Amino acid sequence: FYQQQVKPFGGQLIAVSDLGQAELTKSLSILENWQGKGAGLQLSLPEGNGKMGAIYLVNKDDAAQSVIRIGKRSMTQDITGEYYKSSLMNFALGGAFNSRINLNLREDKGYTYGARSYFNGGKLSGYYTATAEVRADATDKSIVEFINEIKDYSERGITDEELMFMRNSINQKDALKYETPRAKLGFLAQILEHDLTPDFVNQRSEIVANITKAEINVLAKKHLAVDDMLMVVVGDAKTLRPQLEALGYEVFDYQI
């Protein structure tokens, strides 16, 4: 497999080091005899057949906690387009410690040590998920709070205060984002992978500074419709099933 697939043609090597270019290049001379082009991979992703609005229950006997995931397929990754703007939209809902979801489930209710939501995308596929590990006896109540928060944000949108906090938080975080060697490596890899110019950072800063409340609310309505989502719960099925069915959802047993 490695002889056929792992070849250097078309690859790029990125290094962040205190070595000069000549010394670093010399140290990589061991790779000079590695030649060739790997066979192409034909990748395809099957369509999901899950039922939206249902709960898929994975049993773990006597679990003290339940893991909840609520989500759907979503966008592939982009750098300055709708995917990036949607990550800004999600910030107030589930992308920060003081997001609505975390303040509700952790700080107010005490159901979990942390709850969050996020978009995750690659070149071929993407998804949106809201997730937490919660006390087993609060599984049903946690789902209710998740759904209420997502639905409220989708329908009523972001507040002025949340928009300002998002802008300040993202800008402050980005100011330190490329300080470490590992971060610099990731920065360069991102430029090469997406064929970017280094000023994409400035482009993102402009988006953060100028995205409007109306734009964010349109994205929330478009991407956070709970009727388009399904739920996965991992926990003690014999105690959870009656609770989950009492919420009015169809519950399907699922094995991994």
Which sequence ranges carry the predicted segments?
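Charge-rich, well-structured scaffold segments of protease-associated domains
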Residues: 1-40, 108-109, 113-256
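His/Glu-based metal-binding/catalytic segments typifying zinc-dependent metallopeptidases
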Residues: 39-98
